[in-house]
Amino acid sequence: MSGESISTFQFLGLTFNTTNLISGLVSALIVFCVVFALSRNLKLKPTGKQNILEWIVDFTNGILRDSVDEEEEKNFGLYAFTLFLFIFVSNQIGLFLQIAWNDVSYLRSPTADPIVTLTLSLITMMLAHYSGVAKFGFKKYFEKTYLSPFKVWLPIGVFTEFIDFLTLGLRIYGVIFAGEMLLKMIGGIAFSGGIVNMIVAIPLALIWQGFSVFLGSIQAFVFVTLTSVYISHKVEDE
């Protein structure tokens, strides 16, 4: 472990994680700036930076298309697009922009904290449940989700929902947290044992950093894919 702690503050008797707030805001700001820059001067025939934006939109829509029908793809397209970009950027921040002072982290990957990833998981679940109720009505949706194929299925259905919530959020947290910890360990080796350790550690850090970029990208894809599958279970007719 790195020995670093997080920054917090108190408000109305509640403790807030300053590190997560700053990191999440920075990630959101980066996403906003990138999308804003790519979406200027849109043309009917895309060229240059507009191609990049449309490729990302097509990519996330394609993920949805594999799980839901065309109508639901339109309903959740913006959510999938935003979710993918936010998670992708959040996964990479800790590799390039970590900021700490006096062993207190102020900027790191937001997704390296289970509170953040479980919150994203909860948002997805709430959106899926809301959409299911809006489409089928509460009674039919409840029966479809928790009482099918048998009424005694209710405890298993509730337990399954809880497991889905945990696995969706904790999978990405485990990968990103482990990646950051390993980078910190390699960095500690580089600066604690002289020039020989540094010569060995720096190439290892670069290799692992490149691999972590790949893992972060894959995890963003996996999260959105699982999100689309989860949503499809709630809004699609069986």
From Swiss-Prot:
Regions crossing the membrane: 18-38, 76-96, 114-134, 150-170, 188-208, 211-231
Main localization category: membrane
Membrane topology recorded in Swiss-Prot or TrEMBL: Multi-pass membrane protein
GO molecular function terms noted in the UniProt entry: proton-transporting ATP synthase activity, rotational mechanism
GO CC field: plasma membrane; proton-transporting ATP synthase complex
Matches recorded under Pfam families: ATP-synt_A (PF00119)
Subcellular location(s) per record: Cell membrane
GO biological process, one term: proton motive force-driven plasma membrane ATP synthesis
Keywords assigned by UniProt, alphabetized: ATP synthesis, Cell membrane, CF(0), Hydrogen ion transport, Ion transport, Membrane, Transmembrane, Transmembrane helix, Transport
Subunit record text: F-type ATPases have 2 components, CF(1) - the catalytic core - and CF(0) - the membrane proton channel. CF(1) has five subunits: alpha(3), beta(3), gamma(1), delta(1), epsilon(1). CF(0) has three main subunits: a(1), b(2) and c(9-12). The alpha and beta chains form an alternating ring which encloses part of the gamma chain. CF(1) is attached to CF(0) by a central stalk formed by the gamma and epsilon chains, while a peripheral stalk is formed by the delta and b chains.
Family from the record: Belongs to the ATPase A chain family.
Function: Key component of the proton channel; it plays a direct role in the translocation of protons across the membrane.
Protein name in the entry: ATP synthase subunit a
